[in-house]
Amino acid sequence: MTTPQRGEVWLVDLGMAAKVRPALVISVPAGDADRALVTLVPHTTSTRGSRFEVSVPVPFLRPGAFDAQGLVTIPHAKLIRRLGRLNPIQLAQVEQGVRAWLGLPAAGQTGGA
């Protein structure tokens, strides 16, 4: 299997309740000494208007949004097939939503009191 790369969108088996859906890889590739895990932001077509839903129109996905509140880490074995890749601007938009959800500083800023 191809190693998933940050910025790629894969069709993923997230289990019975979450079903098979597209998801964006946001973790770095696992090294030889690491567990074969990948962290993803699921894509949903059932949006709720949350500020943590990031709409990124791409031709290989139905209209919807990446749900930063739905972060999940799964084994590579749950990846079904690669659907495509976001460009750097699109990836940065989703990363911004993830940082907001996790309360992390914006890119280029440092946290602190």
Predicted regions and their residues:
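Conserved functional hotspots at enzyme active or ligand-binding sites that engage polyanionic ligands
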Residues: 1-113
